[in-house]
Regions:
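Short glycine-/aliphatic-rich beta-strand segments at the starts of folded cytosolic domains
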Residues: 49-64
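Short amphipathic alpha-helix segments
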Residues: 66-86
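Helix N-cap motif at beta-to-alpha junctions
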Residues: 107-112
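A common structural junction motif
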Residues: 120-128
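Short, low-order "capping/linker" segments at domain edges
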Residues: 139-154
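Short coil-to-beta transition motif at edge beta-strands of beta-rich domains
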Residues: 152-163
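Short beta-strand-centered aromatic/proline hotspots
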Residues: 166-172
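Conserved small/polar residues in nucleotide/adenosyl-binding loops
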Residues: 204-210
Length: 210
């Protein structure tokens, strides 16, 4: 195999092949022309053009989250990307703090939804999804997704005052939390609507922002 460069875009490739078939020696020579063309992959083009399909808005309810808490929430996205099958659209277009929270703009709606599910399972809270139509292609609507995630103002193990008594969230459920009464070890389920008026009175592992 010999490569002979003709110019910056064309190369002649000379190939010699030999083989023995039924004790007979065969030899062949071939020449082909290879042409190089510059191109950019679709994903690279989209990333360079600030393409995005979804925005995840990290917010809080009841109290203002600290920078550390927002950083911890943001780091969970890296874990989600690692655990999901490789997809060239799983990229971050831009991100940064905004008034009242932190926004992450993503190249994939599927990634945004997976992250939202992960946030709820690990940190509780609620996700509100809205979809907007931004155009049409091949007869189908092109849409963008906005996920608003609100983290509760307390974590598992914290003590909250709810319905005049002290409770401790022990686990998150799909629509709320399982809470345990501090005095009697009584357990019950509560939806986020039920917990709207709950106030945290003791934090286990938290330094509140000043």
């Amino acid at each position: 195999l010999v490569a002979q460069e003709v110019d910056g875009r064309h190369t002649l490739i000379h190939i010699e092949m030999e083989g023995i078939i039924d004790n007979l020696l065969y030899a062949e020579r071939h020449t082909m022309r290879a042409r190089m063309s510059n191109g950019v992959c679709l994903t690279c083009t989209r990333r360079a053009g600030n393409y995005f399909e979804a925005t995840v808005q990290l917010r809080s309810s009841a109290r203002r989250l600290s920078e550390k808490e927002f950083s911890e929430l943001r780091l969970t996205l890296d874990k989600v990307i690692i655990e999901m099958p490789d997809d060239p659209m799983f990229f971050i277009t831009k991100e940064g703090p905004v008034t009242g929270g932190y926004d992450v703009v993503l190249g994939s709606k599927a990634l945004a939804r997976a992250w939202g599910r992960h946030l709820i399972s690990k940190h509780g809270g609620q996700v509100t999804a809205t979809t907007s139509v931004v155009g049409r292609k091949d007869g189908a609507d092109l849409t963008r997704l906005t996920l608003l995630y609100r983290k509760p103002g307390y974590a598992l193990g914290d003590v909250i005052r709810w319905r005049g008594e002290l409770w401790r969230p022990s686990s998150w459920s799909g629509e709320g939390a399982i809470v345990e009464k501090v005095e009697k070890r009584e357990r019950t389920g509560a939806t986020w609507r039920d917990l709207e008026n709950a106030n945290a009175v003791s934090y286990t592992h938290l330094t509140l922002p000043t």
